[in-house]
């Protein structure tokens, strides 16, 4: 899980979602693409 000031999709499979007021990127294809805005 990377924590960065601005999150963006790295590949086509990445999905930008909102959980508990936080913007996150989840990726079923490549778990290394997981990010959270912080």
From Swiss-Prot:
SUPFAM superfamilies: Ribosomal protein L36. GO terms for biological process: translation. The keyword Ribosomal protein applies. Keywords: Ribonucleoprotein, Ribosomal protein. One of its GO terms (cellular component) is cytoplasm. It comes from the Bacteria. The keyword Ribosomal protein applies. GO terms for molecular function: structural constituent of ribosome. Belongs to the bacterial ribosomal protein bL36 family. NCBIfam families: rpmJ_bact. This is Large ribosomal subunit protein bL36. It comes from Synechococcus sp. (strain JA-3-3Ab).
């Amino acid at each position: 899980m990377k924590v960065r000031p601005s999150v963006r999709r790295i590949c086509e499979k990445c999905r930008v979602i909102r959980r508990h007021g936080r913007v996150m990127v989840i990726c079923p294809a490549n778990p290394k693409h997981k990010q959270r805005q912080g």
